[in-house]
């Protein structure tokens, strides 16, 4: 008796369905976690900092995998450039007459990053995790004189950042909102001044009470 052609497909579907179901549930849970962590910028970057420290300690302890470290540093630099660069290059807008601003209000547009902060964080964190896993495979430990890679990366970093800074000054944009640190500084200063005033007021209230008590003692005498 020959098996029906559809029986094998049904069996494969039955076997694969639990795995596919688990994959879908894991994907939803992970995406839910990412969505909930989006507002917590400081906590997210602290996690990335911990991952970076663990990776650096791993490379330092085994004293190897310098090519992987060079690739990781170059990739992080590329992400940083995307994070600091505008989504639309002003140089290309200047060459296109159709994209020129019609009125003066269009000249001051909000800075939109080519790579948003959340995507920058996610890609950087994933890069550190992947690089850490790669350090457990000995065939990836290519022998190389690491000071050459370090010098080459420093030169690459200097040239890239110099070009980016010149581009910022030329087209008059700044990738950070300076108003938020100023508001935070004002809040901290006002909080300290309010605390000092309250403390001074408490001290002033204590002085009359002490003087009144001394006058009462004199009257009793």
Curated annotation (Swiss-Prot):
Signal peptide: none annotated. Keywords: Membrane, Transmembrane, Transmembrane helix. Residues 200-221 are annotated as: Disordered. Residues 209-221 have a biased composition (Polar residues). It holds the Pfam family Rer1. It is a multi-pass membrane protein. GO terms for cellular component: cytoplasm; intracellular membrane-bounded organelle; membrane. It is found in: Membrane. The chain crosses the membrane at residues 41-58, 64-84, 128-148, 149-169. Its main location: membrane. Belongs to the RER1 family. Involved in the retrieval of endoplasmic reticulum membrane proteins from the early Golgi compartment. PANTHER family: PROTEIN RER1. This is Protein RER1D. It comes from Arabidopsis thaliana (Mouse-ear cress).
